[in-house]
């Protein structure tokens, strides 16, 4: 159970400048201070706990999860927490069609695995250099989903504004979305919104670790 004091200490309550707000976030706001919207942490705690409970139940039934967060503040913690709980992640650039064109993505994953196992000793220097460039690009794009053999059942999104393409693909396929939603975002863009500061690393660390713990709990049931 997440405590409000923990959220406060991590700066989860600090939203964006009031002039940048999305009016749909009004129900989740506590007040405004010095031109900054302050998020209602009572609601954040409730909705975070609700999301954690959902994850635990879903994962206990064998559902798989994809973490998505490609902006610099989110990249490292997304990889760390997804890896810790044994799930998948995208923390660089979202590949358009990753979910809606899964067959093509599978072929790229196959190509990546082939390159990982390739013997480049017999190649010319130019050929080997070209393959290494291709391999490095695929490493950045694919390493978080290298063992993903089907589309995920749940996608956790840091900043639905930034990851709009991923969110739209999830909606098209009926994939459950859980989003960390700041005051400039639309909470209705995801199935389960967690109102929170999506720019501070401490805030993202706290929330994503809570979600990862819920996944681990589900796997232990």
UniProtKB/Swiss-Prot annotation:
Molecular function GO terms recorded: mRNA binding; structural constituent of ribosome
Where is it chiefly localized?
A: plastid
Location in or out of the cell: Plastid, Chloroplast
Gene coding for it:
rps2
Q: Which InterPro entries match?
A: Ribosomal_uS2 (IPR001865), Ribosomal_uS2_bac/mit/plastid (IPR005706), Ribosomal_uS2_CS (IPR018130), Ribosomal_uS2_flav_dom_sf (IPR023591)
Is Ribonucleoprotein one of the keywords UniProt gives this record? yes
SUPFAM superfamilies tied to this protein? Ribosomal protein S2
Q: Which Gene3D superfamilies match?
A: Glucose-6-phosphate isomerase like protein, domain 1, Helix hairpin bin
Biological process according to GO = translation
Q: Which Pfam families match?
A: Ribosomal_S2
What domain of life is recorded for the organism?
Eukaryota
Keywords of this entry: Chloroplast, Plastid, Ribonucleoprotein, Ribosomal protein
Question: Does the keyword section mention Ribosomal protein?
Answer: yes
Assigned protein family = Belongs to the universal ribosomal protein uS2 family.
Q: List the disulfide bonds.
A: none
Q: Report the GO terms under cellular component.
A: chloroplast; mitochondrial small ribosomal subunit
Q: What is this protein called?
A: Small ribosomal subunit protein uS2c
